[in-house]
Amino acid sequence: MLDAAVERKYSASPGETFYTGGGAQTFTNFESDDNSRILTVHRAFQHSVNLVFVRLMRDIVHYEMVQTTGPSSEWLGDTATRKMYLTRFADQESRVYMKRFYTKYHGKTPDQQITLLLLGVRKSPPKVATALRSVAPDQSNAWFNKMMYAALKNTPSASMLDDEDLANLYDKYGINRFNLNDRGYISSVHPLELWTLNYLRKHPDATLAQIETASQDVRLSTYSWLFKTRYHATQDRRIKRMVELRAFDAIGKSWQALGYPFASLTPSYAAAIGASGDRPAALAQLIGVIANGGNKVPTETLTQIDFAKDTPYETHFRRAVVAPQQQVSPEIASEVRMLLRDVVTGGTARRLAQGMTFPNGETLEVYGKTGTGDQRLNVYAKGARLIESRKVNRSATFVFALGDRFYGTLTAWVHEPYAARYDFTSALAVQLLKSMAPALQPLLDKPVQKTVTAVPAESTPAATKVAAH
């Protein structure tokens, strides 16, 4: 079954746009020659073909959606379940907005806050008036008039408005005349931005947590439109987003068990091709699990510490033996090891296809996986026209195992402004490891240390042995 799984075929075409709750994404392959091919997972793993793994990740996410939540008929067809997910979505997304607006206005003076708000308001008397009356409802007519003239300066409206017009605007767009959603519509400002600024002007020392608590009902009311039946298709997309997040959460937890170092996984298919941001130590731990037949063996720096030797206070601390934890079944570990070996024998790490030969003539089999990183900052104009592309980072990584004893990660990394000067692939990391054979020779000369279960020794006045975790 595992052999059949890695021979499953996927298109490597970059012509598809992939949609998740986070938005639309497109991907490219490192080698354009792969674009028209249909490849097995095995072959794509050998040659690092991105689009195959993007589509594989999509299948995994869809599988986890069913595993965590059930078939779509269960969470789209039940009214109570739909309401639960929509409420959860509204709460989650509104918190994102609240954090954004809190960061924007917190710590600024009242005048600075108003100036910052009006920068994003179109210079129309109704819009400016609604924004001002929403965030500062208790201010006087005189203050309102002053702010209106300042905001509309150098516009035709400024010369046309007299005191009577301003008084009418003051009354017409008062905070009690329209609900929050309507005021957001009139002013073209997000309703939660109006509410947040109004709250901060009254409670300048409020924390984000306090604002989130105080705004609980308000945040849900701003999404009242979402619960209307005429937005059924929109509701379905939001519900799918929440179910999808549960799937990514489940995937993230399974990755954490194998050493993934972060608390959550970015909900994107790009996680399958490196966007998840693994650290070198985490990659080394993962291949260590594969090298140990699926077992996670604890990392040890010190195994024993001796204090006050040959004195009455002599004490020995010995690390307690921890049994290996089975993280991956031996069958899966064996299959992955085969794939990793094929990367070296016929894929992107071919420079070590004959193994790694050391100065003493000994040759160790090598298996591993390469990865090339080309992180760019792209700036787009209207119409998705690319106007700037700047290299931010360039990296080449090889996570490897040598024989049955050694494994690790080797990464070459260049940060801007120097990244633009370099153009290399993961072959650099492979060649670098190959050239390090003389430096690694002393490791081979050390005898293999057998792990022996410690047996507590009898305590004597001159020697106390303590097991330490």
Residue ranges and their predicted role:
Residues G22-T68, S72, T348-R350, T372:
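Polyanion-binding and phosphate-handling cores
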Residues M1-N35, W75-F101:
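Extended charged low-complexity segments that act as oligomerization/scaffolding linkers
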Residues Q67-G70, D78-T79, E244-P261:
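Short, charged, amphipathic alpha-helices and their helix-cap/turn boundaries
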Residues L2, H42-R43, V54, T103-R237, ...:
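A penicillin-recognizing enzyme superfamily signal
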Residues L51, R55-M57, Q67-Q112, Y231-I239:
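N-terminal leader/propeptide and maturation segments of large enzyme subunits in energy/redox metabolism
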Residues A257-A271:
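Extracellular-facing binding/remodeling surfaces
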